Amino acid sequence: MKPFKFEQATTAVQASRTHVDAAPNARFISGGTDILGEIKEGILEVNILVSLAGLSGASEIISSDVGLELGALVTLVRIASDQSIVETYPALAQAAESVATPQIRNVGTLGGNLCQRPRCWYYRSPLFDCLKKGGETCFASDEGNKYHAILGAENCHIVHPSDVAVALLALEATVVVANASGDRQMPIGDFFVSPDVNMLAENVLEPGEFVPKVKIPKPSSGTRSVYLKAKERQAYDFALSSVAVSLEVRDETITQAHVALGGVAPVPYSVPQVDSELTGQKIREVDVQAIGQLAVKDAQPLSDNSYKVRLTASMVARAVSRLISE
């Protein structure tokens, strides 16, 4: 590991300008559970790490009548245990609780979880010069692709590793992006980019930009949500497949639905055809198995991951079934 500088920023302007001045060999750091791993593994070389830990308001949780504001440095353990989140945004609390181990959740942050890099073993190995690292080959295309994408992938078959992003997508969250000039906001679905749009990045952040907070609109009184995650080891693992579902139910009828998938696509994956199919249905008449199959109708599995098609369909069916039974 090569030596690098560490700077503690105290303002957004300072953080942004320091990052721009040292680009492309600068990175922001919050909890560091992902980026330090990349550096230690020899995947990433940096000249400077710019810490966001000193920014005002970055660790705040603000609940109001209009919704929830989460600072990007709020730890995952706080999200999982905050009573206002557990009661009003259960899918988010469940997603945060599912991440890694208690030790990592105590350090890992919301912003870091959203901006973490792929866990693809070809990308993470210094032995493979894959597309994600500027090479010419996706080595997962032909073999060794048990954990890779079945939806939304063409040339590069990574899956996005974030759990909380999937829940936030179902909850219609907004991401705030900051730089030295100010802030801009966007739906969380627009924050992530697939390899087909930008092979070398997973989100829209430009040099000098970072995420200071995330906003979630307050759900109506008839809204219920859930996050489910399938993984090989219950103790600590990334998702083989995950699903977040938010349903608004009035008079036994689903008036609004949002379903998001994780562990199966290069980005947290919306399934609008499922949202449309659920909306307007009486909860007693929902065919959850058909809904599950609809969620994976566009799946294109690789040589070793066809199991994800069945698994994901089952996960969607279970999640919807749980909510309509509440």
What is each model feature region?
Residues 1-326:
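C-terminal structural segment of proteins
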